[in-house]
Regions:
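Membrane-embedded alpha-helical bundles that constitute the cytochrome b-like, heme-associated redox core
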Residues: 1-179
């Protein structure tokens, strides 16, 4: 029938890998980030800061790849959910992608503000987005911290929606993304 959305069972394997990789990296990044306000200035703290910077660079790389893959390979559509739900899900996913990407760039700038280098996997140095003491970079750090709460709220909505589909609607929405 014209205009009918074909039924697709699962996401492709790379989409699933990227989804769960980004989730794991962001969860680890959040855990390390939560420890950072409570640290002092000793060698052990510098290791924690280095981990946060390295994880941030890894998150940035993973979300950039996921975003490029998503653009090249749109989400498989399904008739299992209403059109309005598909639209809300699509909008939420794009906001999550862009929010995570923005947080990594803002964190990068905030790191430069403190005069610390940003290295991908602790090896490949990335260019500075700002100079040490740059007022914009300080603001970037404040926004970076604020966006953590926005990200947590959106992830909570994402998880609740997935659980709703699995346990209440009893459709395949959640299972399509499971490994």
């Amino acid at each position: 029938m014209l205009g009918e959305v074909p039924m697709v069972r699962d996401y492709d394997p790379l989409t699933k890998i990227l989804h769960w990789l980004v989730f794991l990296l962001v969860a680890a990044q959040y855990a390390v980030g939560e420890l950072m306000p409570h640290i002092g200035r000793n060698a052990q703290d510098e290791g924690l800061i280095a981990w946060h910077i390295s994880l941030g660079a890894a998150v940035m790389l993973a979300i950039a790849v996921a975003l490029a893959w998503r653009i090249a390979h749109p989400v498989p559509q399904t008739q299992e959910i209403a059109l309005w739900q598909r639209r809300v899900a699509t909008a939420t996913h794009w906001v999550l992608y862009l929010l995570i990407l923005a947080m990594t760039v803002l964190g990068w700038a905030a790191t430069n503000f403190r005069g610390w280098p940003v290295k991908l996997f602790g090896v490949l140095p990335l260019p500075a987005l700002a100079s040490k003491g740059d007022r914009w970079a300080h603001t970037a750090g404040d926004i970076h911290s604020l966006l953590v709460n926005v990200l947590l709220a959106l992830v909570a909505i994402h998880v609740v929606a997935a659980l709703y589909h699995h346990f209440i609607a009893r459709d395949r929405v959640l299972r399509r993304m499971l490994p």
